[in-house]
Amino acid sequence: MKTMKLLRYAVMLVFVLASIRVITGASDLTSTGTASAALLLSVPIVLAALGGLFSERSGVVNIGLEGMMIMGAWAGGYIGSQHGPWAGLLAAMIFGSVGALVHAIATVSFGVDHVVSGVAINIIAAGLVRYLSTLMYKNGAWPGPSQSPGIETIPVNGLPVLSGGSYFGWKSPDLLGSIANLNWFFISDLASILRGLTGDVSYVTMVAIAFVPISYFILWRTAFGLRLRSAGE
């Protein structure tokens, strides 16, 4: 029942956006690129939200999420520029976890106020990565400490049949893309948005979005999740 209600709201939203596109002529409003960019930019927010969800459910107020993500982003950029994107992703996870570990030890083991610890991590992380950037890039290996290093892109793919992509040498049809190119009111707008959300999506984005239902299952459908939520209560 709740799922159907959400679907109705989603369809109504697409209809409103399609109407605005026709009235204003803003073709990018429902374009594939706009939907794809929105999905890509939502990944850091989703990951931070999931981190905050687990922290809150365990009884820890985690204001230091920003600092942890800053640390992970720096490590991912530096290691990724040296050893490739997958090594950079692993380094980002490890370096970000260090910040989480510091917060956990400070609040749980030493009883430091959660807000104070979180704010401290945010401040320290910002200064730490600035110092590390100056230290690592001072010899001209990169234009400067304020410039992001170049990293190879992680491969992308699409939903078979619906959004194109390539699977084991087989080139999948792009049904949604074909419908989007027909320029039918609402139908093509809906297809264009769905094409942006399911086509040319990075594997990391796929995993990040998959973490949402997985986190729900862990927290509300497993014994571990029950114990975690009980500890937070």
Positions of the model-derived regions?
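Transmembrane helix-bundle core of multi-pass membrane transporters
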Residues: 126-219
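Transmembrane alpha-helical core residues of multi-pass small-molecule transporters
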Residues: 95, 121-125, 211
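Hydrophobic/aromatic residues within the transmembrane alpha-helices of Major Facilitator Superfamily
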Residues: 42-43, 50, 124, 128, ...
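N-terminal membrane topogenic signal
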Residues: 1-13
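Membrane-helix/interface signature in polytopic inner-membrane proteins
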Residues: 214-233
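Single transmembrane alpha-helix segments in multi-pass membrane proteins
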Residues: 33-89, 93-115, 119
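Membrane-embedded alpha-helical segments in integral membrane proteins
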Residues: 14-27, 71-78
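Membrane-interface helix termini and inter-helical loops of multi-pass transporters
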Residues: 25-31, 193
